[in-house]
Structures are given as structure tokens and as C-alpha cells.
Amino acid sequence: MASKCPKCDKTVYFAEKVSSLGKDWHKFCLKCERCSKTLTPGGHAEHDGKPFCHKPCYATLFGPKGVNIGGAGSYIYEKPLAEGPQVTGPIEVPAARAEERKASGPPKGPSRASSVTTFTGEPNTCPRCSKKVYFAEKVTSLGKDWHRPCLRCERCGKTLTPGGHAEHDGQPYCHKPCYGILFGPKGVNTGAVGSYIYDRDPEGKVQP
């Protein structure tokens, strides 16, 4: 039974479909949610199950501020501060509050765990190793937080970059050869990543 395209909600037939984020799309419906640029299956970032181009849209909207995690979408541009009256010159601090600050000593810096809670809340669990993923070591892909070494191709174990890979049933795969061999539509060139698959002979050997 043909599935429905999540963008236009119309039926997607085999000859016109591309698969990404666990869904079947019309080729021209797989577009960036922000700038509407046409995307290729697996060759894009995602957030909350929706596709985004890596740059500038994903990086601008969702990349961690000031932290380069080495993956796609690892930068974000700071938004300007909300407009309001700017205060110039020294700010007067009441004497009582100044004395209170002296008594309590200098403010303590946040611990590693508390800083994680401040930015991300309770740490998520890595879908690969089932251990907690802290902010400084995480990469985000397929709507989940992973340890960087845990984001690997399900078939060959190659380490992947966030958004820079294909996916099937919520699992990451490298584009070539794994996704193409396992899931690419046979004999149909959709012009997208992972659009070819090689038939296997009865003995299990891959035929070009």
C-alpha cells in the first residue's frame, strides 16, 4: 500500500518516492523547513522529525552556541539582544547588598553537571550504548542525542557525522555502499543519494 507524503499528505508511488527520516516523500516535497531548498535523502540535518539544510538553517536555528562539536550544524550565530533601554555609566549598588556580597564571598562557578542541566535539562540516553549523554560530548541526529563515537553505520560500523548520513527505520547508515545496497530502490534512479541498489546473486555475492 502506497504511503502518504508528510509534506503534501498525498499518496507517494514507488517511482516518485524518496525515503528519509523513516518516511516516504515525493522527491520535490523533501525540502528544508526554513528556506525550502530541495534536499537529498540522508544529505540533510533534522530536528523534531523535520528536515533542514545543514547551512545556514540548521546551524542558525539549532547548533550549540559557541561549541564546535566537529559535526554538521555545530555552529550557531548569536541572536541580537532584545531591544531595550541601554544603561551607561556605573550602576549604584545599595550598601546593604554590597556588604552581603562580601560576607558570602565570590560566586562559585557552576559544576559540569549543573551546567549540563542548565542548558539541556536531564541528560538524554545514547540509543547505541544506553548511557547518559552530557552536553560536551553529544552529537544530535535522527532526533536523538548520541555520544560522538556511538553514531556509527548500522552495517559497517563507520563513524558518521550528524545529518551527514542516510537512515532507515530510525537507524543511521553511511550513504555508500551500505544504504544503497540495503535500501536503494532497485533499478530506479531518483537522482538522490542512495538511489541505486545492487542485486545479489543466489550465493550472496553483490553484482554490479
Curated annotation (Swiss-Prot):
The record's listing under Pfam families reads: LIM
Q: Which residues get modified to Phosphoserine?
A: 104
Q: Which GO terms describe its cellular component?
A: cell cortex
- Give residue numbers for the modification (N6-acetyllysine): 23, 138, 144
Q: Name one GO molecular function term.
A: zinc ion binding
User: Keyword annotations for this protein?
Assistant: Acetylation, LIM domain, Metal-binding, Phosphoprotein, Repeat, Zinc
Which GO annotations describe the biological process of this protein?
A: hemopoiesis; positive regulation of cell population proliferation
Give expression by tissue: Widespread tissue expression; highest levels in the heart.
Which residue stretches belong to region Disordered? 98-119
Please report the stretch or stretches of sequence annotated as the LIM zinc-binding domain: 5-57, 126-178
The subunit field of the Swiss-Prot or TrEMBL record says: Interacts with TGFB1I1.
Name of the protein: Cysteine-rich protein 2
State the organism of origin.
Homo sapiens
